[in-house]
Amino acid sequence: AIFAAFGLGKSVMQIETLRLIHARAGGKVLVICPLGVRQEFRRDAQMLGVRFEFIRRESEMTPDCDFYLTNYESVRDGKLDVNIFTAVSLDEASVLRSFGSDTYQTFLQVFKTVKYRFVATATPSPNRFKELIHYAGFLGIMDTGQALTRFFKRDSTKANNLTLYPHKEREFWLWLHSWALFLQKPSDLGPLHSDEGYALPPLTIHYHEVPVDHAGAGEERDGQVRMFRDAALGLSEAAREKRASM
């Protein structure tokens, strides 16, 4: 699993991982991603000397291409059999965070026999234990029920409130780091990588007070006078508020 913050190059990491697996194991490889990021993958792949083709079903595959992109719906709806691929990576894999979702349950079954599986998404919150366990279940690292029993004590007063056993805390984080990479900033890779240009400067906030005349708040349909101007919910109301506050 690749858990990396925004802008750290998750797409490049996935492409290079699949390229190396393809060079060693052969076959065809696949990235499953939202439609909005497929051009980003194509651009980054070109930088690495790899050509990706976007497909929605197996019939669109060509003999001269081994690297493919598809969207989540094509796999979830059964249009594309992922078992024909040597390796598959799920970009924006946060769609798997909910155990009860159709996507998670479907993917858990159809990916069981895919030899090399990867997930890539932004770094989950450290206390989102169930989300981390769901990724482990999908990747075939450990069954979700087994992980819950092994590492956590339940709270009988509150559902889904998990607490790490104190004597299992170190073991849990070591286990997690045996299959997942966490990156919050470039310097997490070592002192040779600077955070300059990545760490944002402190946010400067300028407050502007706009005087409002509540005498023109108007009336309700029943004639009741409004105490305050109402929220600008519609286009005409928003335009009126803009004119009055410019």
Q: Which residues fall in each region the model found?
A:
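Conserved helix-turn-beta segment of the N-terminal RecA-like "Helicase ATP-binding" lobe
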Residues: G36-S59, L139-D143
